[in-house]
Design a protein with these regions (language model features):
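N-terminal glycine-rich FAD/FM-binding segment characteristic of electron-transfer flavoproteins
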Residues: 1-222
Length: 222
């Protein structure tokens, strides 16, 4: 029995959300009295995950996973969870993770709760608080399946460093050839995306016209 957490990366580097889900998953592992295993895909410097509580890192290096494919990623994470006898799987709530999580749940025959905002209220039964109705209300949900999947809401737990040193090992999932082929990917690299932004500032008719939008755009560089 263990807790497994998927740590999302981009161009080999971990996102802040990866460290947050590791911090959160470590707290759950401590409550359960078990270990925390992180799984990374084509990421570098996985020792960073130990700083936030990972005891072990399963490193997946696979060219076929260079571009996100929900089914392939779900299969890889599901196989990693099964190899560790994980009873709790923690994911972030990025766009990719939201797309992939239901597929992982199907693979593992697991209950899945998204937009989680706190540690489990109780372990037996497993009850957890999450936001609903576009964050206008909260719900306390009980997961009854043997394997439980948690989607941690962004900035719901924060970063918590520990003194752990993660042990890394290679993991090679068995993947089928994807039906989808990515020809090219174009990304805006000079600005912070809305998904990664700490604060979002909106503006409207008070700015009169597009010639005044510069003052708002400048705030994104502060």
């Amino acid at each position: 029995m263990s807790v497994l957490v998927y740590t999302e990366s981009e161009n080999g580097s971990f996102k802040k959300t990866a460290f947050e889900v590791v911090s959160y998953a470590k707290a759950i592992a401590t409550e359960l009295g078990t270990t925390l295993t992180a799984v990374s895909i084509n990421a570098s410097n996985t020792s960073q995950l130990g700083v936030y509580g990972a005891d072990k890192v399963l490193e997946i290096t696979n060219d076929s996973l260079a571009n996100f494919d929900s089914q392939a990623y779900a299969d890889a994470i599901s196989q990693a969870a099964a190899s560790q006898d994980a009873t709790v799987v923690v994911l972030s709530q990025t766009a990719n993770a939201k797309f992939m999580a239901p597929l992982v749940a199907v693979n593992l025959e697991a209950g899945y709760v998204s937009n989680v905002v706190a540690l489990p209220q109780s372990i037996t039964p497993f009850k957890i608080k999450h936001s609903v109705y576009t964050n206008k209300a909260f719900s306390l949900t009980q997961i009854n399946t043997p394997v439980k999947i948690i989607g941690l809401g962004k900035n719901a737990y924060g970063l918590h460093e520990t003194s752990a040193a993660a042990v890394s090992e290679a993991f090679s999932p068995s993947l089928q050839q994807s039906d989808t082929k990515v020809i090219s990917v174009d990304k805006a690299t000079d600005k912070v995306t809305i998904a990664d932004a700490e604060v979002v500032v909106s503006a409207g008719r008070g700015l009169k016209g597009p010639e005044n939008w510069g003052m708002i755009e400048e705030m994104a560089t502060i």
